[in-house]
Design a protein with these regions (language model features):
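A late C-terminal transmembrane helix in Major Facilitator Superfamily
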Residues: 20, 209-244
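Extracytoplasmic gate region of multi-pass secondary transporters
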Residues: 85-148, 233, 237
Length: 293
């Protein structure tokens, strides 16, 4: 994708958002009627029964005639950009890595423990499931809206308010007193919106700041920050709750991490210009596409 890469990424990732909306309600029904063991087994069957067949039947490399003209014309010419080693020597690579890690630690554990937080505030299981469905809806909105804005404006400016707003969610969730349903929904929506935005952001910025030459490798290493931080975050939230008896300390730390992660992105600077593949470099008579990025 060249012209609207941000929106394309957002649309591609909406499947996880739909799952996040539907699965809390489905899981609650399964637990209530069949128990948690059956619920786990049913969830395990979903990727085998739905995702795997879809991938085997329809996920493939496009044929030459199906490719966009600018890609088909380029043939085997190397794409512009950095190699993984070159990217890792740039400070902005580690700035982006740190930003991803901070924001992921902040929201990933909150997502896992949000039903527990709501239960401690007097929410029934069905009410907590409804709030989690709103979380999924906001991920959907975050991916589409952020993807569209990334194509129009400088990414760090787009994401600064989006990643700072979940700090308000952390403040809302502090304490152990009664919590209004609409307030809980607001907290879940803001955090979910940021979650959707960040997923778009990693894929988008990997291409804009380091080019497409080694995009897969660079994106993979950047995504390690997401995967490792998500694993640490859920355990960290649980450890704080079990040790101190409250989620408040980790929620305060998460609010700081949201803001710090957003501010770090401002240090990335303008997008590099990797140049465009010329007609001579392509060895083709096809003129280069001036709108290709």
């Amino acid at each position: 994708f060249f012209k609207q890469r941000g929106l394309a990424l957002g649309l591609t990732l909406v499947g996880t958002s739909i799952s996040a909306m539907a699965l809390p309600i489905i899981t609650t029904w399964l637990i209530n009627d069949f128990g948690w063991r059956v619920s786990y087994a049913a969830l395990a069957l979903l990727p085998l029964g739905i995702a795997l067949p879809i991938g085997l039947l329809w996920f493939r490399e496009p044929k030459p005639e199906e490719r966009p003209p600018e890609i088909a014309a380029a043939g085997a010419v190397s794409l512009p950009g950095r190699s993984l080693q070159e990217a890792m020597r740039e400070p902005r690579f580690w700035i982006l890595w740190a930003s991803i890690a901070l924001v992921t630690i902040a929201y990933s554990g909150a997502l896992v423990h949000l039903p527990s937080m709501l239960g401690a505030r007097g929410f029934e299981r069905s009410e907590a499931a409804a709030v989690m469905s709103v979380f999924g809806l906001s991920i959907f909105a975050g991916r589409i809206i952020t993807g569209y804005l990334l194509d129009k404006f400088w990414a760090p400016i787009v994401t600064l308010p989006i990643l700072c707003l979940p700090a308000l969610s952390c403040w809302i969730l502090l304490g152990d007193g009664p919590l209004a349903f609409v307030v809980a929904i607001t907290a879940a929506f803001l955090m979910g919106f940021a979650s959707g935005a960040e997923t778009d952001l990693v894929a988008y910025l990997a291409g804009r700041y380091f080019g497409m030459k080694s995009y897969g490798q660079i994106y993979g290493v950047l995504y390690m920050a997401f995967g490792l931080s998500a694993a640490v975050s859920a355990t960290l939230y649980g450890w704080v709750r079990d040790t101190i008896g409250s989620y408040d300390p980790i929620l305060i730390a998460a609010a700081v991490m949201f803001i710090a992660g957003a501010l770090l992105l401002l240090l990335l600077g303008p997008y590099p210009d990797f140049g465009r593949v010329t007609e001579e470099e392509r060895g083709s008579t096809t003129a280069p596409n001036p709108s290709a990025k």
